[in-house]
């Protein structure tokens, strides 16, 4: 038994995707596995300690070097680490990269009426001389989950796969149970954590977090925190290039807005993107306030929201930041 941070993250919308088109659901899994493979390669070939001193902090934040266990099952993943601070930063970066992997499709949709619509171009398996062009959809890869800290026990239970016996790896303990319970407490692609995790964080990690603004059924604060994971893409070391850094805001906001517009008539889905958009805006404000350019980002945000939303929509979605 040891003390670890444990994250439980789940793909939003995966169940509906499996029901409607299993092949597109498999594509969602393939995308985040591709990102994981890339991070695994980087940690082996270019560990953050090998970078020059000014870049080591950035390299560490964008790696997965703190991931000790990464255990996927269907659309869910358990991840564990002994280093809470690095873990939260790197988990946030992983979630950010998962969405950005195909976000360009939604930012510049082939069919504005459906930003997930695209096509697959490849070689015809039955005739290698022919190119095939198949219409398809690419659902966004967005995670929601929880992180807890506490006792974790690593076990190796017996299992079967394709009638073959094998020994699998498993995690159990209080931290695992608490992480799973947090996953569905709020709407949107958000990663929550409790005060036990917060107590373990250094100042850098705390900067990328906030108290969850939602209240419980009695109107009381939930008493939980969340990772401002859209903030992970900004290079805070580039203060002099703050105008260029605004591109990251639009890299996230534009595809999220187009997806919200597409699902706007479906309230159950739309609210997921409304919470996502608010998280993107809050994260940008946090970064630019830190860099000393708060007035700049507030102007850009106000300008963007005014051009995209009605006054009622702005008040409903962004009441916590405007």
Task: Mark where each language-model region is.
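Short, solvent-exposed loop/turn segments at secondary-structure junctions
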Residues: 14, 152, 197-200
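Core nucleotidyl-transferase/polymerase catalytic module
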Residues: 3
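Catalytic/regulatory signature loops of cyclic-dinucleotide turnover enzymes
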Residues: 148-150, 174-195
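Active-site-proximal alpha-helical element of nucleotidyl cyclase-like catalytic domains
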Residues: 23-63, 90, 94-97
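Catalytic core of nucleotidyl cyclases, primarily class III adenylyl/guanylyl cyclases
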Residues: 6, 44-87, 105-171
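Catalytic-site or vestigial catalytic-site microsegments of nucleotide-handling domains
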Residues: 6-16
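Short, His- and charge-rich active-site/binding loops that engage polyanionic ligands
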Residues: 98, 102
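Intrinsically disordered, glycine/charged-rich C-terminal tails and inter-domain linkers
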Residues: 188-322
């Amino acid at each position: 038994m040891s003390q670890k941070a444990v994250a439980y993250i789940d793909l939003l919308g995966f169940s509906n995707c499996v029901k409607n088109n299993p092949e597109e659901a498999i594509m969602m899994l393939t995308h985040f596995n591709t990102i994981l493979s890339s991070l695994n390669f980087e940690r082996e070939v270019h560990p953050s300690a090998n970078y020059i001193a000014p870049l080591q902090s950035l390299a560490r934040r964008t790696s997965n070097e703190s991931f000790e266990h990464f255990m996927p099952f269907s659309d869910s993943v358990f991840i564990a680490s002994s280093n809470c601070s690095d873990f939260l930063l790197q988990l946030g970066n992983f979630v950010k990269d998962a969405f950005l992997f195909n976000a360009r499709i939604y930012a510049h949709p082939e069919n504005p009426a459906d930003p997930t619509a695209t096509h697959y171009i490849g070689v015809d398996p039955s005739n290698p001389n022919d190119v095939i062009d198949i219409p398809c959809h690419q659902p966004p890869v967005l995670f929601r989950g929880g992180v807890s800290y506490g006792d974790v026990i690593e076990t190796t239970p017996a299992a079967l796969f394709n009638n073959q016996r094998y020994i699998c790896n498993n995690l159990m303990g209080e931290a695992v149970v608490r992480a799973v319970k947090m996953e569905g407490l709020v709407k949107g692609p958000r990663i929550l954590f409790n005060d036990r995790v917060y107590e373990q964080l250094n100042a850098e990690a705390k900067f990328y977090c906030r108290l969850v603004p939602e209240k419980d059924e009695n109107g009381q604060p939930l008493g939980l925190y969340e990772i401002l994971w859209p903030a992970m893409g900004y290079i805070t070391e580039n203060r002099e290039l703050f105008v260029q850094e605004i591109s990251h805001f639009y890299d996230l906001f534009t595809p999220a807005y187009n997806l919200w517009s597409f699902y706007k008539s479906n309230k159950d889905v739309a609210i997921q993107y409304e919470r996502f958009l608010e998280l993107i805006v809050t994260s940008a404000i946090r970064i630019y306030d830190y860099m000393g350019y708060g007035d700049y980002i507030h102007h850009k945000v106000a300008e963007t929201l005014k051009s995209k939303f009605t006054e009622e929509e702005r008040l409903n979605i962004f009441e916590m930041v405007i």
